[in-house]
Amino acid sequence: MAAFTAQDVKTLREKTGCGMMDCKKALTNADGDMDKAIDFLREQGLAKAAKKASRIAAEGVAYATTNADASVGVVIEVNAETDFVAKNDSFMDFVKACAQTVIEQNPADVDELLTLKAAGTEQTVAELLQEKIQTIGENIKIRRFERMEGACVAYVHAGGKSGVLVNFTTDIAVNDEFIAYGKDVAMQIAALNTPYLTEADVPAEVIEHEKEVMRQQVINEGKPEAIADKIVMGKIGKFYKENCLVDQEFVKDNKQTIKQYTNNTAKALGGSIEIAKFVRFEKGEGIEKRNDDFAAEVASMM
């Protein structure tokens, strides 16, 4: 009996973009272990480095905003049952009230946020949430948020599919030119799903794992083991350039990296800019939605 399900095949396919039969073979080889199956596909040259997060499936929005002088920012995710709700003005008013409450009152977590008086109302966030559930007719949940202090720029991508908040260390006033630069950086993070800021932020275990997979991939391609390590080092350099924000090519101008774009902007504005940190939330990240028809299709092949 297979050590995995039709849903596992579906999930692996979504994570890697590989064909159904390749995914089934990988899961069989890995005895149902999802991460090992991903590594198997990569070692065979069938899949690129997969971001090991479940498929985006929940509805609602990821939203990001700042206060008036861009000295405090928040990125927040609020989930609902259907994508229709994300276009509902009443739902978006609730999301914005939650974000403003986080900016003004700095709750430690969602549980504390629910107890606070919602910005611009006389109700607690929990009371306002229950009111929205009743009037909209769907279950609504505040899933997570992150708040930052200091120069911040917020960006909402594709109508709430993802929200990005970028925090900067700078001696430059956050004016229109600075915000335009900051939004370029945030858009890059949103579009490429950038996982790390710098090479130093990549965990050692991630690099070791990448090296192991890359080395096996090189050997499977028929390269001599004697030169495998040298090839792997070149591939690791490429990994950094693809996954570390400051080393990435700027999507609007691939002749410069994000670090170079940052330095050039700072020079033009007469000061210094350093990207301190960033957070990207994607709507429904890690939440699965059932797809019975697809699962049945896969099951019929097992």
Task: List where the protein language model places each region.
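N-terminal assembly/interaction segments in proteins that build large macromolecular machines
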Residues: 2-302
